[in-house]
Amino acid sequence: MQPRVILTDIEGTTSSISFVKNVLFPYARKALPAFVAEHGQQPEVRRWLDAVATEIGGACQDSLVAETLQGWIDQDRKHTALKALQGLIWDEGYRRGDYTAHFYPEVAPVLKGWHAAGLPLYVYSSGSVPAQKLFFGFSDAGDLSPLVSGWFDTEIGGKREADSYRRIVQAIGVPAGEIVFLSDVVEELDAAREAGLQTRLIDRLDDYPMPRIGQAANGHERVENFQQIQL
């Protein structure tokens, strides 16, 4: 069945893992203490600081929360509060021009081609929806956000859980079998397949020097870049 809708991951799929790990994460880690001190009383920030404080044992100083968040960055923890606060920090960095978001060079032309062909594109990433919009809006290929019909993050559920994809299918409103999910993570693709979606394993040599073929692909169609995706 030919897909009618595309659902894509970002890190390791449209964009280099190294950009996130070597640029965005260190930027947020360094900025966290000052950001929390300056913006900690703003409702959109306070909400997440209080959530972290509750998780680590109740009332505690914001400086301790900031240290905890820095530790979570070091652990690459996929925590919704951390992702939300990182997104707010990255917003400042993007708008100041401190960096632009990396996209592999073939991605933007392919996305534009799908858009012109009438194929809706949705994004599902562990990064918060505001961070996703910044990533596409301030990319090194220009503003790609008009190509995206909708955004999903871990507030809808974890990316390795089939129910998350079932909820996304309901939100998009087309049969699961008509949606193709693009990701570099086999376990995410497994969950999407369990929910009835089509899948493609994005296996970029820059991010995965050892090609994942045979058993390593676990039955998912493997491509090395977006130009190889046949829809």
Swiss-Prot record:
InterPro entries for this protein: Enolase-ppase_E1, HAD-like_sf, HAD-SF_hydro_IA, HAD_sf
GO BP annotation list: L-methionine salvage from methylthioadenosine
Cofactor(s) needed: Mg(2+)
Pfam families: Hydrolase
Catalytic activity: 5-methylsulfanyl-2,3-dioxopentyl phosphate + H2O = 1,2-dihydroxy-5-(methylsulfanyl)pent-1-en-3-one + phosphate
One GO molecular-function entry: 2,3-diketo-5-methylthiopentyl-1-phosphate enolase activity
Pathway the protein contributes to: Amino-acid biosynthesis; L-methionine biosynthesis via salvage pathway; L-methionine from S-methyl-5-thio-alpha-D-ribose 1-phosphate: step 3/6; Amino-acid biosynthesis; L-methionine biosynthesis via salvage pathway; L-methionine from S-methyl-5-thio-alpha-D-ribose 1-phosphate: step 4/6
Manner of cofactor binding, per the entry note: Binds 1 Mg(2+) ion per subunit.
EC number: 3.1.3.77
Record-linked HAMAP family: Salvage_MtnC
Family stated for the protein in its record: Belongs to the HAD-like hydrolase superfamily. MasA/MtnC family.
Assembly mode: Monomer.
Functional summary from the UniProt entry: Bifunctional enzyme that catalyzes the enolization of 2,3-diketo-5-methylthiopentyl-1-phosphate (DK-MTP-1-P) into the intermediate 2-hydroxy-3-keto-5-methylthiopentenyl-1-phosphate (HK-MTPenyl-1-P), which is then dephosphorylated to form the acireductone 1,2-dihydroxy-3-keto-5-methylthiopentene (DHK-MTPene).
Protein name (Swiss-Prot/TrEMBL): Enolase-phosphatase E1
Species assigned in the record: Stenotrophomonas maltophilia (strain K279a)
Upper classification of the organism: Bacteria, Pseudomonadati, Pseudomonadota, Gammaproteobacteria, Lysobacterales
